[in-house]
Amino acid sequence: MQRFKISSEFNPSGDQPGAIDSLVRGISCGAKEQTLLGVTGSGKTFTMASVIEQTQRPAIIIAHNKTLAAQLHEEMRSFFPENAVEYFVSYYDYYQPEAYIPQSDVYIEKDALINDKIDLLRHSATRSLLERRDVVVVASVSCIYGLGSPELYSEMTVPIALGMKLDMCQLQERLVELQYKHGNRYERGNFSVQGDVLSVFPSHYEDRIWKISFFGDEVDSIQEVDPKSGMVTLKLEKIKIFPNSHYVTPRPTLLQAISEIEKELDECALQFKQCNKIVEADRIVERTRFDIEMMRETGTCKGIENYSRYLCGKEAGDPPNTLLDYLPQDAIMFIDESHMTVPQIRAMYNGDRMRKANLINHGFRMPSALDNRPLTFAEWEDRKPTVVYVSATPGQYELQQTGGVATEQLIRPTGLLDPVCIVKGADGQIHDVMCESQATIARGYRVLITTLTKKMAENLTEYMREMGIKVAYLHSDVKTLERIEIISDLRLGVIDVLVGVNLMREGLDIPECALVGILDADKEGFLRSTTSLIQTIGRAARNVEGRVILYANVITKSMRTAMEETDRRRDIQRKYNQEHSIVPRTIQKPVQTSLSERVGSSRKKVSRDTNTDPANRDIVELQKEMLLCAENLDFERAVEIRNEIKRLTAP
């Protein structure tokens, strides 16, 4: 069995050894929950990796957004190059949920754009969890959403070995059952036959094909082939073909599920008729019968996840299968930036109840569709394994769960202190932050500026660009892989200033940043709370020149508390440096190959002159409006905007 082994030129230093020992001791003694309070730049990721190495237990690290998850994934891959470090996030680049608007009698069909590369990584994650123990999965909260049963997924795999008696026709039937497509194109999830050779492109790989040669009904050879060059890269003795969908179901189970679906359909149609809802009764019968026929013929149908209750053999109201069910019982769960991630997990369940209720009440879906859902918070609590909450500002929940006790990690291995905080008046803040940015850039450093709204971020970006500054903005409308690319460009110097809103807080690891400007710091609210301010201040804590300017006309309670906590930490760090004769130095961290490059992001290279083309500007604005309408459940308007975008982008 492959063991976890960290590959790093660094050794634990500062208070890292104490934090690692404390967490490992707690896990060894059976502590179910612990909290690591670690300041930005103190090496929390290295501490997590060290805990994994010392305990030799599989792990899942949950982050609250895809950008942070991608960053953690890159770091963990560098620490564990010989182990399986996987990435599991939502594979939707665009998602318009199925919905019905009763007021206008408009049904909106589900519309989604799936990122095939992220789907590949999801399959790679589940495959690794089922095949080996040296696995670290970095995930978003997508890990608490419904996923196919791990038992069925594992049961459906097809093992093949040299010398095995195997009928090629039966193997082709099995591959179709696993949702592989027959075709000559070398694409993931396809297979083809040429004479006595069957070629299959596995669901969890993007760069290799397995060629299985037969001599009669016996497997004669198994070769791994590069799909681009056609060269044989490896000769194998055995392989295991995993399903091309997490919702594959053995034929007998599928037929049993169809029987149960038909029973519910009869009951549902009868209830509608008894209520004199003839249109709804006809609608549910027509739609469900079509799905049933598709499942009988192909083993799947559009929206098959809505029948997951039956496919997984569950009762009404039972928790769905999720990625957590694929984890070994002794796995460790790290909740990164827990003050943000835990509330996000808590909020997931209620998100789509109203939308599904409308679909069910009007005959578009049966009540069993409600079981296609994320875990409730209580269900997540029941299923979570050994947990370590990780944050510079742990929330009330985490501290309650651990009895108010947290393992502190305040000393940075580099000797860096928390940044100096300066308060300046908010009047004239734009001019001042511009001048401060130019001075910082002239010294070869980067700048982060945080605003209160997306519009402010975009306007400030446009203004700074007009003034000759290389700048980009970062907010929730920017696609996942594009965010990763923008952060990489900032580190490489393609851009010098990054303007953002809430995304500027947790997890942005940019050692080149020597200035953080917080506009309107005295506007009390979520974005300017004590926790938010401490997190934002921490973005400047990776550079020896790091400083923070808070623009405010009054010092609020949140500002005072944040600055006092920063000063407390600075005092502890300064004393430690004096006692150990440490001279602070800026973190040295190479810019690694971005996830978007590795998964082959299909997006075009982001232009740093965004919104200069009027047509492009119109499309960007329409996309923002469409997403806002979807968030507000105005699906009818969202569809109209989507159609307009398609018209504008048509060749």
Curated annotation (Swiss-Prot):
Q: Start and end of every UVR domain?
A: 616-651
| One cellular component term from this protein's GO annotations in UniProt | excinuclease repair complex
Alphabetically ordered keywords of this record: ATP-binding, Cytoplasm, DNA damage, DNA excision, DNA repair, Excision nuclease, Nucleotide-binding, SOS response
The principal location of this protein is: cytoplasm
Limits of the Helicase ATP-binding domain: 25-411
Q: Motif Beta-hairpin: which ranges?
A: 91-114
GO terms of biological process kind: nucleotide-excision repair; SOS response
Q: Which region ranges are annotated with the description Disordered?
A: 593-615
GO-annotated molecular function = ATP binding; ATP hydrolysis activity; DNA binding; excinuclease ABC activity
Q: Which residues form the Helicase C-terminal domain?
A: 427-591
**Subcellular localization, per the record?**
Cytoplasm
The superkingdom of the source organism is: Bacteria
| HAMAP family hit by this protein | UvrB
The name on file for this protein is: UvrABC system protein B
What high-level taxonomic lineage is stated for the organism?
Answer: Bacteria, Pseudomonadati, Pseudomonadota, Alphaproteobacteria, Rickettsiales
